[in-house]
């Protein structure tokens, strides 16, 4: 696919699609709640539609209209055995959280996905769930999908110190803990996104959060809700960076989710001297949302690492692009988790941006980016990773000497089906 190149800047207002993490979880909690859940501004992208498909296969009635998704909950014990394997496509969130949701059911399940999912590590979820009494294994006894879950296992409480900072692992344990006897205690390594915890409370459940320690009791009942999903800050990040690095730009992003566990990119933009203002903030779905305004800016390099990394892990590819347009060196460290995303994002970012003229060195746990560098025409690939594909489209906006051809552009539909249309709507 030939990407959009434009040196004239981007001007206008857009509303980014609903938050991907919250869209997944709204279906999951709606399914195990009693009564009806109505979800507005749901992310209708491949990953989240895969979650809907999986719960329909488990006997949950889900209606889809133009404006909303309506989930008719089965209650905490009402899921039914699927007729065949659950195919969750490309969604790491779906497979890992479903492992927790299905760990204590009275039926067997097989969960599989695409070739990317088949390469992603699952022991980080499987081992703590097995410690709770779940029986599950990967293909041929490995940790890789397809994952087979054996039913009719009683789950017991656990105190668990997480070895990695992962909201997916934490959420899988929480979902399993809801089916276990007693109180499960989870100690996080670093603070990660907390949508699951907040949604438990929103659906009428109880959970204690004290710093890095979470306590959740089993046997809880949930009540269906009406909710509006705020815009995904990870999707907004591409337009934030586009507005900062394309000369003459000013972009307003409305109804963006402002959960503090997700807004690390705002802190980085401030460190680098970028113009980013948040206004009109309000509560939506129990979460803060607001309008984010960005303008083209002169940027300087910075160092990014430590406990901010879980707050911006999905934004690192586009932050790396931002750093190519900053004066000086930017160092990103403590981000080895990038190696086990849809692709090895450390290598993918360095390989593809270097093709375009960037000066980036990959490291074991991050990137060293030397700026400021002009970007040039090239043939690039997304590696089938939606965030790499969208980052490369933003990079292409700076190219003046020819075309940028993107291979595997279809990956973008995993999280943002209207991405290219929204870019075009902002062209001067």
UniProtKB/Swiss-Prot annotation:
Gene Ontology biological-process annotations: amino acid biosynthetic process; aromatic amino acid family biosynthetic process; chorismate biosynthetic process
Transmembrane segments: none
The keyword Repressor belongs to this UniProt entry's keyword annotation: no
Sites where the protein binds 3-phosphoshikimate: 20-21, 25, 166, 168, 314, 341
Pathway: Metabolic intermediate biosynthesis; chorismate biosynthesis; chorismate from D-erythrose 4-phosphate and phosphoenolpyruvate: step 6/7
GO molecular function: 3-phosphoshikimate 1-carboxyvinyltransferase activity
Binding site for phosphoenolpyruvate: 20, 92, 120, 168, 345, 387
Active site: 314 (proton acceptor)
Catalysis performed (reactions): 3-phosphoshikimate + phosphoenolpyruvate = 5-O-(1-carboxyvinyl)-3-phosphoshikimate + phosphate
A GO CC term attached to the entry: cytoplasm
Entry keywords, A to Z: Amino-acid biosynthesis, Aromatic amino acid biosynthesis, Cytoplasm, Transferase
The protein's enzyme class: transferase
InterPro entries: Enolpyruvate_Tfrase_dom, Enolpyruvate_Tfrase_sf, EPSP_synthase, EPSP_synthase_CS, RNA3'P_cycl/enolpyr_Trfase_a/b
EC number: 2.5.1.19
Subcellular location per the Swiss-Prot or TrEMBL entry: Cytoplasm
Principal place of residence: cytoplasm
Family indicated by similarity: Belongs to the EPSP synthase family.
HAMAP family in the record: EPSP_synth (MF_00210)
NCBIfam families reported for this sequence: aroA
Subunit structure: Monomer.
General function of this protein: Catalyzes the transfer of the enolpyruvyl moiety of phosphoenolpyruvate (PEP) to the 5-hydroxyl of shikimate-3-phosphate (S3P) to produce enolpyruvyl shikimate-3-phosphate and inorganic phosphate.
Designated name of the protein: 3-phosphoshikimate 1-carboxyvinyltransferase
Natural source organism: Listeria innocua serovar 6a (strain ATCC BAA-680 / CLIP 11262)
Upper taxonomic lineage: Bacteria, Bacillati, Bacillota, Bacilli, Bacillales
């Amino acid at each position: 696919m030939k990407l959009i190149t434009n040196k004239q800047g981007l001007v206008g207002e857009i509303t980014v699609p609903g938050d991907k993490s919250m869209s997944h979880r709204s279906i999951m909690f709606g399914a195990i709640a009693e009564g009806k859940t109505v979800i507005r501004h749901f992310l209708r992208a491949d990953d989240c539609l895969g979650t809907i498909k999986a719960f329909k296969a488990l006997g949950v009635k889900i209606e889809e209209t133009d404006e909303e998704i309506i989930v008719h909950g089965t209650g905490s014990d009402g899921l039914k055995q699927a007729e065949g394997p659950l195919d969750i496509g490309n969604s790491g969130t779906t497979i890992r959280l479903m492992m927790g949701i299905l760990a204590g059911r009275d039926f067997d399940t097989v969960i599989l996905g695409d070739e990317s999912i088949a390469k992603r590590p699952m022991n980080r979820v499987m081992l703590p769930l097995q410690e709770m009494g779940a029986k599950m294994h990967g293909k041929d006894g490995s940790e890789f999908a397809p994952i087979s879950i054996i039913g009719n296992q009683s789950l017991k409480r656990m105190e668990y110190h997480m070895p990695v900072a992962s909201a997916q692992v934490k959420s899988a344990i929480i979902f399993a803990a809801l089916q276990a006897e007693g109180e499960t205690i989870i100690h996080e390594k670093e603070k990660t996104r907390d949508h699951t915890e907040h949604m438990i409370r929103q659906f009428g459940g109880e959970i204690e959060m004290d710093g890095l320690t979470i306590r959740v009791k089993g046997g809880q009942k949930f009540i269906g809700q009406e909710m509006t999903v705020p815009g995904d800050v990870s999707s907004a990040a591409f337009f934030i960076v586009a507005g900062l690095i394309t000369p003459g730009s000013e972009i307003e992003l409305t109804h963006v989710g402002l959960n503090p566990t997700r807004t690390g990119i705002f802190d980085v933009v401030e460190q680098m001297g970028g113009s980013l203002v948040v206004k009109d903030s309000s509560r939506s779905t129990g979460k803060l949302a607001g309008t984010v305004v960005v303008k083209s800016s002169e940027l300087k390099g910075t160092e990014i690492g430590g406990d901010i990394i879980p707050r911006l892990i999905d934004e690192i590819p586009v932050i790396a692009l931002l750093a190519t347009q900053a004066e000086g060196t930017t160092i990103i460290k403590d981000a080895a988790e990038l190696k086990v995303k849809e692709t090895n994002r450390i290598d993918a970012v360095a390989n593809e941006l270097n093709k375009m003229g960037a000066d980036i060195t990959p490291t074991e746990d991050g990137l060293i980016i030397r700026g400021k560098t002009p970007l040039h025409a090239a043939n690039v690939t997304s590696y089938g990773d939606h965030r790499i594909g969208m980052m490369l489209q933003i990079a292409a906006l700076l190219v003046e000497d020819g075309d940028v051809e993107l291979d595997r552009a279809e990956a973008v539909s995993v999280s943002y089906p209207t991405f290219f249309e929204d870019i075009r709507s902002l062209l001067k």
